[in-house]
Amino acid sequence: MTIDNKIRHIVKEFKAYVPGKSKEEIARNYNINPDEIIKLGSNENPWGSSPKIKEEILKELPNIHQYPEPVNPILMEELSKFTNIPKENIVVGGDGADEIIDTMMRILIDKDDEVIIPIPTFTQYRISAKIYGANIKYAKFDKEKDFKLDVDSVLNNITDKTKIIFLCTPNNPTGNIIDKKDIEKIINSTDALVMIDHAYIEYSKEEYDLTEFALKYDNVLILRTFSKVFGLAGQRIGYGITSKKIVDYMMRVKPIFSITRLSQICAITALRDKEFFEKSKNDGIKSMEILYNGLKEFKELKVYPSEANYLLVEVKNGMSSGEFCVELLKRGVIVRDCKSFEGLDGEYVRVAIGTFEEDRRFLEILKEIVN
């Protein structure tokens, strides 16, 4: 007898998610000083988080033996002010925005229900859908049009069994945004939940705010996170903006104490530090411009415009994306090989923003490999 006989078949078919490489791993494998490694593989904030957070964490440490409040009223008030959305339309989750995704799966998905996922995009949508037994219908971001969303490929997949449509904008890993009118067209074509992932929206240079859709329609949920511009990826906290009806359903089934006391303190402090937020956002956009302009100089690479904190780069010098990444690793630079992104055929890597000095060093190192 063996426990293997009791494991769900879908779980047996899964391979464990492989995250971006850490500085510590590369330091060990390539005998490089960790302080000299340039990490551009995980879409993190290279400037860290608000300097005010450390002091607030120290104040909270005496209380960590106590359970956190499931709904922290101070955090909800700060989020409401930051988003200009009533707090009754906001739900906060631990584990970044992933908990929000998982909670909606619990609420909506029965076995053999359908979800629509335009690809290439964030892998977590597919993983969650499969775990809950959904059938995935793939739409597409059109490579021939710089990965613009093929709206018809979404609309043509909508059926009575469609429960969730995922729209990542700016899209990961391509960096482009989806036209607002196209999103509203999709919303008006279905009663399924349209989940709009806005993890990187603060880096967009365009006037692009879709929160009105979450108040106008009862089948829209907008995902936001503290992991990027706020620099709190290690605290794992995200939130959703949606109808009061959906908030009510989510509060019935989401984990009760998933947002730790320290995560709540970090989020509150980050929201209050407006100066850091603006500098982090503006420096991130400037870093993107440095990388984009620098990468365009290499004729052996094709770089795509981006409204996020990363760039999609096609390797066209005869190397595979894996070989390209290894050559960078040998020189202490981490970027993301995009082979794991379904629907992205070819040799692509994703390069996230660094500090201005890291950007400069990366572009210099790149000359050794590409040229």
UniProtKB/Swiss-Prot annotation:
Keyword Iron in record: no
Any one biological process term the GO annotation gives: L-histidine biosynthetic process
Keyword entries, A-Z: Amino-acid biosynthesis, Aminotransferase, Histidine biosynthesis, Pyridoxal phosphate, Transferase
Catalyzed chemical reaction(s): L-histidinol phosphate + 2-oxoglutarate = 3-(imidazol-4-yl)-2-oxopropyl phosphate + L-glutamate
Cofactor(s) listed in the protein's UniProt record: pyridoxal 5'-phosphate
EC number: 2.6.1.9
GO molecular function: histidinol-phosphate transaminase activity; pyridoxal phosphate binding
EC class of the enzyme, as a word: transferase
Keyword Transferase: yes
Similarity annotation: Belongs to the class-II pyridoxal-phosphate-dependent aminotransferase family. Histidinol-phosphate aminotransferase subfamily.
Name used for this protein in its record: Histidinol-phosphate aminotransferase
Source species: Methanococcus aeolicus (strain ATCC BAA-1280 / DSM 17508 / OCM 812 / Nankai-3)
